[in-house]
A protein has these predicted regions:
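Intrinsically disordered, low-complexity terminal regions
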Residues: 1-405
Length: 405
């Protein structure tokens, strides 16, 4: 009778602790240890209540989260592997990596805590796999160095890694990702994206919200963005196939290749080439030394110290502003649609061997200087009655005005 009362008392006490949020271990947690080739592996699995928020925080290892439409609770499996020939040594290290799982309020926690000193074993790997209901409102994942992979969640997802890669797909709300140096890849995300890596590449397939992508030196590629983007890289290339809204792209030295942009564009590179297929708004493009090609834009400011410039001006229905095209040493070719109305002013400073040519009779070209001495070219005119100013200047190079077809 006394033992029965003690058992009942213990059960009631544990239940009270669990309800108060002080019970750390999951009730359904199980542990298995087995030989894995020359190493030893431990598998810890368990189940937690299907709450709306998940926090995973581990000292080492990868984290994988998958959302399921029919998933009710939260199921997790932690697999740890130590490269120890001795089972006794392996068990000692397994004991030093504490895995706890619990629910407190509306948040489920899964924690991997290395307690064996500041230095973790060299021959060690781990992965935490978590199955969650798709209707999670927030999933936050943190690892000191492993990869992070999350998909199939209707809410917001946040991930932080000390240096591993990060992958998101099929996320219903926004995402935030930060890694010390790994790559970041995003499939389809419905909300806003905030992506930061110390030096890895960033790739986004389809974003329905605004995109902020920053990397210390890797390349950035966006296939489709629905609401504009800000892209910054310390030196990698930038590629955007399609983006609605305003786009700002900046790199310390890589090339920038843009497709169809549904708003104004700001482009800046320390020395790479710039290419743009079309834009609905005004374009500002600047490079320290590469060529610039802007096709299908209403107006543009393009500047390079030593490259050629090609610009095609068309009426896109957007705001039209003054255009200014300038290079220190290179040719400039301007294609003008038949309905574009502009005031043209062009000049070539050192025109020996270079000149200004025009397919438009209303653009008048004249030269100054002797045939064998310093010579310069200028051109002025109004097309379709005039409009915003189109200023074109090169220190040494040809300038050509052509009909856009």
């Amino acid at each position: 009778m006394k033992r029965a009362l003690q058992t009942v008392g213990l059960a009631v006490g544990l239940a009270l602790l669990a309800s108060a949020g002080f019970l750390s271990k999951s009730w359904a947690q199980e542990t298995h240890i087995a030989r894995e080739g020359s190493a030893w592996g431990e598998e810890v699995n368990g189940t937690l209540a299907g709450v709306k928020i998940l926090r995973v925080k581990v000292d080492m290892g990868a984290v994988v989260v998958r959302g399921g439409q029919q998933q009710q609770g939260i199921n997790y499996v932690a697999h740890i592997r130590f490269g120890n020939p001795s089972e006794q040594d392996a068990r000692r290290q397994f004991d030093q990596y504490k895995i706890t799982a619990y629910v407190k309020g509306d948040t489920a926690w899964i924690v991997g805590d290395w307690q064996g000193g500041r230095r973790q074993p060299r021959h060690c790997s781990s992965e935490f796999s978590v199955m969650v209901p798709r209707e999670m409102t927030l999933v936050k994942l943190e690892t000191d160095g492993g990869n992070v992979d999350a998909s199939g969640v209707s809410g917001h997802v946040e991930a932080e890694s000390g240096g591993g890669s990060i992958h998101f797909d099929d996320i219903g709300a926004g995402v935030n990702a930060e890694t010390g140096g790994g790559s970041i890849e995003v499939g389809t995300v419905s909300g806003e994206l905030g992506l930061h890596t110390g030096g890895g590449s960033i790739e986004v397939h389809h974003a329905n919200g605004k995109v902020l992508a920053e990397t210390g030196g890797g390349s950035v590629e966006i296939q489709s963005g629905a609401q504009g983007a800000i892209i910054e890289t310390g030196g990698g290339s930038i590629s955007v196939r399609h983006c609605n809204g305003k786009l700002k792209a900046s790199t310390g030295g890589g090339g920038i290749d843009l497709g169809d942009i549904g708003g104004p564009v700001e482009i800046d590179t320390g020395g790479g080439t710039i290419k743009l297929t079309s834009a609905k708004g005004h374009v500002h493009a600047e490079t320290g030394g590469g060529g610039i090609e802007l096709y299908g834009v209403p107006s543009a400011q393009a500047e390079t110290s030593a490259g050629g410039i090609v610009v095609k001006l068309v009426n896109t229905g957007g705001e039209r502003r003054d255009s200014d095209l300038e290079t220190g040493a290179g040719d400039i070719t301007v294609y003008l649609a038949s309905d574009v109305a502009v005031n043209v002013w062009a000049s070539v400073d050192l025109a020996n061997g270079h000149k200004i040519t025009s397919e438009f009779p209303d653009i008048h070209v004249r030269s100054e200087g002797e045939s064998y001495g310093p010579k310069s070219y200028t051109a002025e005119g109004k097309l379709n009655g005039g409009g915003p100013t189109l200023k074109v200047h090169t220190s040494t190079g040809d300038i050509c005005f052509k009909h856009a077809h």
